[in-house]
Amino acid sequence: MKTLFEEIKASIKNNYNQDRSFWRPVLPWGGVFTIKAGRKAVSCTPLYVEIRLKNTCTIDGFLMLLYVILNENENFPRELSLHLGREFVDCFLYLMDTYSFTTVKLLWIWDKMEKQQYKSEVHKASLIIDLFGNEHDNFTKNLENLMSTIQESYCSNWRCPTRVQEDQQRTINIKCGGLREFSQRVFCHGAPPFVVLNMQHWKSEDLAYVPYYLDLSDHKYLLEGATLFNKEEHHYSAAFQIDGHWMHYDGLRNVNLILLNKPPEFLLLSSLVYIRATEK
């Protein structure tokens, strides 16, 4: 049996102009997970026998991008295991490979998200988990450790209370009359396999104007994908490339994975995703 990634690559290779879509839905919006309740479940309070997921587009696009990234470089699964955990990476790849889409979403929710990042309630016999919100809050926030940076600064005033300062994530402001010199910001844990840039409010047509590569910490990063936002529907989708071909993924559509011949129209850019180039 071919994995999902192998099936997608095969569909690109065998593509005909009249059929630019993948043959089956991939990572559909939402999801229902049925619990096989045993005798002990009768005593549970509250009792529910299924889990229903709503508004999962805030994680769907990035889950699809993460799957593509992990398959693009044989070393990336090992590297990401250091940050996400070996068991998580292995389980994530297995579930995606075998089309277990609802389960892979639950894996991310329960393993990587905090309880306050989503709403949940029991309705009749269902536990409903609602991920409505912002993909930066529901996904990229949980990757901060992977992409964290640090910067040192030095003040010319010897009496400055914080003459030498280390700061993670952001530039600091200190009320002091001296001149503060900042070092180059560097990654805390070395160059990560990928970086995510917040590009909210850019139009998808602007994809033609974004840099296709970045130089960060003596490494080159290549544009691998983007997440897109439909303001009218308050809905996220994603675009990514495999073997030089761009594809658009939208879990809300019946035909949700298609080859692109131009950027999707009437959508805003939400994020750009760059992967570290392989050293030769």
UniProtKB/Swiss-Prot annotation:
Entries under InterPro entries matching the protein: C14orf28-like
Superkingdom in the source lineage: Eukaryota
PANTHER family: HYPOTHETICAL LOC314168 (PTHR35350:SF1)
Binding partners and assembly: Interacts with DRD1, the dopamine D1 receptor.
Annotated function: Could be a regulator of the dopamine receptor signaling pathway.
Name used for this protein in its record: Dopamine receptor-interacting protein 1
Gene it is expressed from: DORIP1
